């Protein structure tokens, strides 16, 4: 968002994307300076959003909640409402590699209890009373009535490598933005796109996730996945203690 100027806005108006996602890291310049080390980052991002709106380009605001912007969470939603832009704030953050083996209170991200509480609070605000009540009832029902699963490895259940893919800044096509495999050069003309896509589908199908998670009674309301397992544990079949606590606390707060 900080890089969007009049020239770029005009470019996107002529070459219209389906949507541009802009991450707001805070609701004021002070937060941007503290978190992103950019004194005027908030002003620049808002200017970028206003330019995209001016040129009638569809925009969505994303938020990534950590300790340093925790108190800005509701103000970020206010900004979305002001500009009539949908907002989605993520309260679960992947850990950095150096944080995998450190206690939660030493992480830059929120501890799982605070992250779960914020998740419920934010979802309530984003959904409104009626829709949130339906969501809460459904989630609690699933948490309380799901039987223990079979003792077998799980598999990728999201759209990655099934109906979606990403191309990163290096031009590598992958099933998931977080996972580094499978990965192929999108600009390698040796194979056509469908050949690359079929390779990605096949290799994604071969990824196995935790047997323990497959058996868990909270599996239908938990955010764990192959990407989270790798980020948290360094292994597709790892079990994240952070996500276990995050899920239990989410259900409790509903």
Language-model segments: which ranges?
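Structural motif corresponding to alpha-helix initiation and N-cap regions
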Residues: 5-6, 29, 70, 206, ...
